[in-house]
Amino acid sequence: MKIGYVQFQPQFGEKEKNLKRVLRFLKNGVQEEADLIILPELFNTGYVFRSMKEVEKLSEHIPEGETTKTLIHFAENNSLNIVAGICERDEDRFFNSAALISSDGNVSVYRKTHLFYKEKIWFSPGDRPFSVYETEKARLGIMICFDWFFPEVIRILALKGAQIICHPSNLMLPYCQTAMLGAAVQNRVFIITANRTGTERGVKFTGKSQIVAPDMRVLASSRRSGEEVKVVDVNPSDADSKRITEYNDLWDDRRTELYKSLLN
């Protein structure tokens, strides 16, 4: 299976331009025979909102919105699975969401659970459980940017059978890329972090998108700056074995009776 990410710099508020640019990256990924490509968080709108009017203007319904409809058409025509960060409107609420657009045109939505900084002003926290989505070649879990700070997220997704964690991001802090090495091996999963780059309204983003294997190997990575699509070949079943040594299994060795304080 070939998996990848797009790293680029959206222009705030320029939804049509951002979508057209991403479609060019996706076409390049298709030329490399990609099966799955992850886009950054809020890829079509930009990130640094300054008013609810901006949120209202730039948000859209999923899957009825123009961004999702365009990506559905592309996914179906190119046998591609896409995970895209979108500013979602649901009646009078707004969410920082990720849409999984499957190659058959089906759409699933995850809403960011752990809102970062001023996102708490604009968005409602996610109201849906951490779910695993079955595609034709792999089982996918989704988290968005700051969700990574909470190790329970990846652990729950891994326990539910996710082989690949899709991680659309707009990272500003410098920790995530290193932390995902540990998260991948601690849960024996692939993690694709698709980060944006550049500066927007005074906020600098860290770039350095990457794909990490269950054994901590970095299979692909980008620099802090620069726009590109990267695709690598993986075997998702590498994430199925939780065996660490002859005597140790990641799931069997858990002592859940001692973990109850995590729920307090």
Regions from the PLM with identified roles:
Residues M1-Y5:
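Extreme N-terminal starter segment of soluble prokaryotic enzymes
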Residues Q7-G13:
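Short polar catalytic/cofactor-binding loops
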Residues K15, L23-S103, L173-N187:
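Cys-nucleophile CN-hydrolase/nitrilase-fold catalytic domain and related Cys-dependent amidase chemistry
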Residues T67-N81, W148-V229:
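CN hydrolase (nitrilase-like) catalytic-core segments centered on the catalytic cysteine
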